[in-house]
Amino acid sequence: FIALAPDGLSSLGGYPGNDADGKEMQRQIDREKLLNDFFNGFEFLYNHDDTTKKIGAVGFCYGGGVCNALAVAYPELSASVPFYGSQAKSEDVPRIKSPLLLHFAELDERINKGWPEYEAALKNNKKDYTAHMYKDCNHGFHNDSTPRYDEKNANLAWDRTITFFNKHLA
């Protein structure tokens, strides 16, 4: 794989190393500009001479929402793996062409609140998706720099992600 790992906070000096300061920094960012930065990253990879044009996206928290937004915006996207990210609007789901592998944390009430409507839209539009709900986990369970980190479930989710990418991108 060729990877591009943009730091959404780079315009403010980059990720500060902890979630509390990171959340404060996120409040200072122009969300539309930030999303366009990620879209530009997709276009850079898609048009790069060294890629096969099979582009996948994986994102965590806000980046999970970016993965859903990329799936809506780019029919060329080959695979999308949002980890506990905000969902696409139901009316936008018909535009999704890429397969989705969605990871959710059972205790993440804020993100999970939107899942039933999103899943219904995915089903109604016959989209290719697989969703996993990780038991007794909280939002951010894959982030090993926080107390919410759950090594067992993080490893399982990552194994599933690599298998998914091998299937759709290799």
Residue map of PLM features:
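Alpha/beta-hydrolase fold nucleophile elbow
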Residues: 49-60
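Acidic catalytic loop of the alpha/beta-hydrolase fold
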Residues: 107-112
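Gly/Ala-rich beta-loop-alpha elbow adjacent to hydrolase catalytic centers
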Residues: 59-63, 67
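Active-site loop/turn elements of alpha/beta-hydrolase fold enzymes
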Residues: 6-8, 85, 134-136
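Serine-hydrolase catalytic machinery in alpha/beta-hydrolase-like enzymes
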Residues: 1-46, 143-145
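C-terminal catalytic histidine-bearing segment of alpha/beta-hydrolase fold enzymes
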Residues: 123-170
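A conserved short beta-strand
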Residues: 76-86
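Short beta-strand/loop motif that positions the catalytic acidic residue
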Residues: 96, 101-104
